[in-house]
């Protein structure tokens, strides 16, 4: 891969991770508001849903940012985007919800692309792979 490809993949991962890092941090710091939103959306077990949301969004966002376990994390975040679109943004008669729904579908496409092609050379996945190769060569 060329350096520009790796730079592009890094920028893409950073941009994909931002939404989750920001949203997950807001959920982490505001559990009552997040759980109230979940109640309004009709979710059961709002405390468990809050924990799951924080783990997926902050953990997945950090993993995507640093390119760690990128392919499986890409699949998890793609599924998360579809699930949240269907649960929280399915009222497409409301223009704002329609925009959020299709934003999530677009993010799903980005995460599927990352799941298919990986993080690139500028990632912890690539570093770990190089380390394994160096250890195997010793």
Model segments located where?
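Short juxtamembrane and helix-loop transition motifs at transmembrane-helix boundaries
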Residues: 31-43
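Extended, low-polarity transmembrane helix blocks
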Residues: 1-29, 47-55, 59, 65-138
């Amino acid at each position: 891969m060329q350096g520009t490809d790796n730079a592009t993949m890094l920028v893409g991962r950073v941009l994909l991770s931002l939404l989750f890092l920001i949203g997950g941090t807001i959920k982490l710091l505001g559990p009552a508001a997040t759980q109230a939103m979940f109640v309004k959306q009709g979710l059961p077990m709002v405390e468990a849903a809050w924990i799951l949301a924080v783990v997926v969004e902050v953990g997945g966002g950090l993993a995507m940012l640093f390119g760690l376990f990128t392919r499986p994390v890409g699949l998890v975040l793609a599924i998360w985007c579809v699930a949240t679109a269907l649960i929280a943004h399915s009222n497409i008669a409301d223009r704002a919800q329609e925009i959020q729904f299709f934003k999530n579908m677009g993010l799903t496409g980005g995460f599927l692309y990352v799941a298919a092609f990986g993080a690139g050379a500028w990632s912890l996945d690539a570093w770990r792979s190089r380390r394994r190769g160096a250890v195997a060569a010793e």
